[in-house]
Amino acid sequence: MQGERKWHMLLTIFFLLITSGQCMDSKEVTQKERRTLLDLILQVIRDSQQREKNTSRRCIAGLLTSAQDMKLSSPEKPFYIPRLDNSRLIEIFPRDLNMKGKFIQHFTAGPVKFSSECRIQFHRLYHNTRDCSRPAYYKRCARLLTRLAMSPLCMQS
């Protein structure tokens, strides 16, 4: 299904690029007005990259205090998207890093304890499954962790 969507999108973009170039072939159009869709797209990309370099430095220095800057490491800094109309920047902040732990502690009614024999299974379940890596499945993750804690392997010691 996704492959079909990509194919349709590529085909649509291809036809748009071809037709935009052919519409400009009339003799009444001056050279200044003769710009293809591809030229416009490339210009917008170049402008946004230049604007991003200039504005992101200014905004990061102005919006974050030194405590917030120290708290956020480099991959967690907000991502700024420049707007075409130069009104305001859109800020995208990352999710709370401890949110998964908070959710699971809430759903299991307290911290879940694991013995040393269960540590490997807990680590695999907590860090490598879809249930524990996506916020929509945290409730399912809490149920799986509770079942693991009650399993005979983990109850031995």
Curated annotation (Swiss-Prot):
GO molecular function: cytokine activity; receptor signaling protein tyrosine kinase activator activity; receptor tyrosine kinase binding
Cleavable signal peptide: 1-23
Keyword Signal: yes
Biological process, per Gene Ontology: positive regulation of ERK1 and ERK2 cascade; positive regulation of ERK5 cascade
Coiled-coil annotated residue ranges, if any: none
GO cellular component, one term: extracellular region
Subcellular location(s) of the protein: Secreted
Main location: secreted
Origin superkingdom: Eukaryota
Pfam families, per database record: ALKL1_2 (PF15129)
UniProt KW keywords: Secreted, Signal
Annotated family: Belongs to the ALKAL family.
Protein name listed in UniProt: Protein ALKAL-like
Organism field: Tetraodon nigroviridis (Spotted green pufferfish)
